[in-house]
């Protein structure tokens, strides 16, 4: 299969190529960039080695439509909503790693992202690619909207509780921390070494664009879900997200009940691992991999459930989940191209 990556020089695009170059069903990967044209990919990213034909090209949608069966968008907001409709209309499958097609309500998107997006026709056509919970729709998708990094960690952690209606709908708190690569490759003062090193910063307080994305999916599982409290922090590491989730139980629970629920919910999931009683995951334990590791606890004193969910923001939170969705869309083994163990230490 021939595939294209638009935005190949960003962190998400680089990770896509890292996995796709070893994918058994991908024969050629065309690389497109708005910032670099005509140079070999390895000149900018020597770590990938000399990949035959990996020349960065100027974005050409018509050429992609003629040559490729699937196009990945690893681009900032506003790019895929402009270019993807042409590809879709020509029968090309599109997997979008940006937020352009995640929200079904255009007015909600415009309020949180401060820009316009695609028409309702394409928003309604888009399938949300939380692989573990939306596989049936993903199998039929032509336009796949890959979840954001924070929503992936939060939703995988919350899904069993919300779907089984075990927690109070107005009690959800998600306290999330991310490595600096989540901010992208473009230089900024906030991600300057001197600003980030030996420092922890909260940002976008009550205003992060992933809030409506998380709430949209939670309400699809339980229409009574109320607005959540969601906080995001930048921490001095390159990769990784830890989402610590708190919610009030509707009735008294036990740790055994919770663990049984999570193990049953994810027993057929290739990339979600539930920890043993009293064990909680660390970001280092999923580094460079497509795994989401989850630990759970119940506080009898407060009646609250605590869920800890960790992912690599560039893999399960971006490129890895996108390839996992590609595999499901094409009817391939879900693990194809993704079975790399985490890098440790």
From Swiss-Prot:
Subcellular location(s) of the protein: Cytoplasm
EC id: 1.2.1.38
Involved pathway(s): Amino-acid biosynthesis; L-arginine biosynthesis; N(2)-acetyl-L-ornithine from L-glutamate: step 3/4
Matching SUPFAM superfamilies: Glyceraldehyde-3-phosphate dehydrogenase-like, C-terminal domain, NAD(P)-binding Rossmann-fold domains
Enzymatic reactions: N-acetyl-L-glutamate 5-semialdehyde + phosphate + NADP(+) = N-acetyl-L-glutamyl 5-phosphate + NADPH + H(+)
PROSITE patterns reported for this sequence: ARGC (PS01224)
GO molecular function: N-acetyl-gamma-glutamyl-phosphate reductase activity; NAD binding; NADP+ binding
Active site: 149
Known function: Catalyzes the NADPH-dependent reduction of N-acetyl-5-glutamyl phosphate to yield N-acetyl-L-glutamate 5-semialdehyde.
Family: Belongs to the NAGSA dehydrogenase family. Type 1 subfamily.
UniProt xrefs under NCBIfam families: argC (TIGR01850)
PANTHER family per UniProt: N-ACETYL-GAMMA-GLUTAMYL-PHOSPHATE REDUCTASE, CHLOROPLASTIC-RELATED (PTHR32338:SF10), N-ACETYL-GAMMA-GLUTAMYL-PHOSPHATE REDUCTASE, CHLOROPLASTIC-RELATED-RELATED (PTHR32338)
Protein name: N-acetyl-gamma-glutamyl-phosphate reductase
Organism field: Geobacillus sp. (strain WCH70)
Gene field: argC
């Amino acid at each position: 299969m021939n595939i294209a990556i638009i935005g190949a020089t960003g962190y998400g695009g680089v990770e896509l190529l890292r996995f796709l170059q070893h994918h058994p069903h991908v024969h050629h990967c065309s690389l497109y960039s708005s910032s670099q044209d005509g140079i070999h990919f390895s000149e900018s990213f020597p770590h990938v080695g000399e990949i035959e034909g990996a020349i960065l090209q100027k974005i050409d949608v018509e050429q992609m439509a003629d040559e490729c069966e699937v196009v990945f968008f690893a681009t900032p907001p506003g790019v895929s909503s402009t270019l993807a409709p042409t590809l879709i209309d020509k029968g090309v499958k599109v997997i979008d790693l940006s937020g352009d097609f995640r929200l079904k309500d255009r007015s909600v998107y415009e309020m949180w992202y401060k820009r316009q997006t695609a028409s309702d026709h394409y928003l309604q056509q888009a399938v949300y690619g939380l692989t573990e919970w939306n596989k049936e729709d993903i199998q039929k998708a032509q336009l796949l909207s890959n979840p954001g990094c924070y929503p992936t960690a939060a939703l995988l952690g919350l899904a069993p509780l919300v779907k089984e209606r075990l927690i109070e709908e107005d009690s959800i708190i998600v306290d999330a921390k991310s490595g600096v690569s989540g901010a992208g490759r473009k230089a900024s003062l906030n991600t300057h070494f001197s600003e980030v090193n030996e420092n922890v910063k909260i940002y976008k307080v009550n205003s992060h664009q992933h809030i409506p994305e998380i709430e949209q999916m939670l309400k699809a599982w339980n229409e009574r879900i109320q607005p959540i409290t969601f906080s995001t922090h930048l921490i001095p590491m390159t990769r990784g997200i830890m989402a610590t989730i708190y919610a009030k139980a509707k009735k008294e629970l036990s740790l055994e009940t919770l663990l049984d629920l999570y193990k049953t919910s994810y027993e057929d999931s290739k990339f979600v691992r539930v920890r043993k009683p009293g064990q909680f995951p660390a970001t280092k334990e999923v580094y460079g991999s497509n795994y989401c590791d989850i630990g759970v606890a119940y506080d009898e004193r407060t009646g609250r459930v605590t869920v800890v969910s960790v992912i690599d923001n560039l893999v399960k939170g971006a490129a890895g989940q996108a390839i996992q969705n590609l595999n499901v869309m094409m009817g391939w083994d879900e693990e194809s191209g993704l079975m790399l163990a985490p890098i440790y230490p």
